[in-house]
Amino acid sequence: MRLFGLILAGGEGRRMGGTDKASLTLGGRLLVTWVAERLGPQVEELAISANGDPARFAGLGLPVLRDEHPQGPLSGVLAGLRWAAAAGADALVTAPVDTPFVPGDLAPRLWLAGEGACAVAEAGGRVHPACGLWPVAVAEDLAAWLAAGEARVMGFAARHGAARAGFPDENAFLNLNAPEDLARAESLLRKDA
């Protein structure tokens, strides 16, 4: 089993005032660094899906993949699947840049839940489809899905009968969409310190 990883960092950050979330800091460190340090050890190769100037990620030493046709997170997933397939990977594990507490066992738990097929994370009764495992075999179906104007991650996951991998810590998938979410994450860091 060859698992590759992808940090989804292509969003516009509208609820953060148009700020590039990858450039936001938590505990004095970039969000993209948090996710890279948590997801990287779980996968054979790691890349970032982002549009705009790739030089802003130069310090991480990771490949930056651009969306062919920006249509939200699934466009990034498609770019990642094509990159992973070209390198001989079996599947791609994704995590958004704004989930800095992503679990250190995300990839293996997703793999086990889906038995190598599509799987998404679930915690506290909520599904987190952007934290998912996508076999490279679904790439062309995803391309067709996007070409048909579909863009919902959960819709594509459901189309492939994605299994759900349960995680006990709700905060593991805390999504930093707004300034108050970032403040909550800072508070959690202080509690854990």
Curated annotation (Swiss-Prot):
Residue numbers binding Mg(2+): D98
Binding annotation for GTP: L8, A9, G10, K21, D67, D98
MF annotations from Gene Ontology: GTP binding; metal ion binding; molybdenum cofactor guanylyltransferase activity
InterPro entries named in the record: MobA-like_NTP_Trfase (IPR025877), Molybde_CF_guanTrfase (IPR013482), Nucleotide-diphossugar_trans (IPR029044)
One biological process term in Gene Ontology: bis(molybdopterin guanine dinucleotide)molybdenum biosynthetic process
Primary subcellular site in the record, as a coarse category: cytoplasm
Subunit record text: Monomer.
Protein name: Molybdenum cofactor guanylyltransferase
Lineage: Bacteria, Pseudomonadati, Pseudomonadota, Alphaproteobacteria, Rhodobacterales
